[in-house]
């Protein structure tokens, strides 16, 4: 059952990340002065994190067993981290390069290198977090089903 939902989960996770990156890029492009953590950016990040966590929890709920949940969550996370991280990197490349150029003289390879590290970390963190959250979703669904009637 999880195999049929994993591609949809990847698409949802990539879309969540792309929306978040587009809004962040717009905020960075409009900023004057050094970047600051604002409530709108904080709320956007929190909403994206909650939506992503929900996708992984549902994926785990649909899994047949604990092992399948961890595997589906980790593989979905790795793929979503790779594809979504790359999409995010392309979206925020311009605004980040402009922001860095305002405050520092760095080699041309610096921003693309930093974004490549971002993609690699997104892949790893999404795989680990996805596996853990999917396992949690499986455990929560199993606990809800095994309760005795009141």
At which residue positions do the language-model features occur?
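Juxtamembrane/disordered regions of integral membrane proteins
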Residues: 1-150
């Amino acid at each position: 059952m999880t195999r049929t939902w994993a591609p949809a989960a990847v698409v949802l996770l990539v879309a969540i990340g792309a929306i978040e990156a587009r809004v962040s890029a717009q905020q960075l492009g409009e900023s004057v002065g050094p970047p600051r953590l604002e409530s709108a950016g904080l709320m956007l990040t929190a909403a994206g994190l909650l939506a992503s966590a929900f996708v992984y929890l549902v994926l785990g709920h649909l899994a047949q067993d604990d092992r399948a949940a961890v595997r589906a969550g980790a593989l979905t996370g790795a793929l979503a981290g790779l594809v979504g991280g790359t999409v995010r990197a392309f979206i925020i490349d311009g605004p980040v390069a402009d922001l860095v150029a305002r405050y520092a003289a760095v080699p041309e390879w610096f921003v693309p290198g930093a974004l490549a590290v971002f993609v690699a970390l997104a892949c790893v963190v999404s795989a680990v977090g996805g596996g853990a959250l999917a396992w949690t979703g499986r455990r929560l669904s199993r606990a809800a089903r095994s309760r005795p009637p009141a």
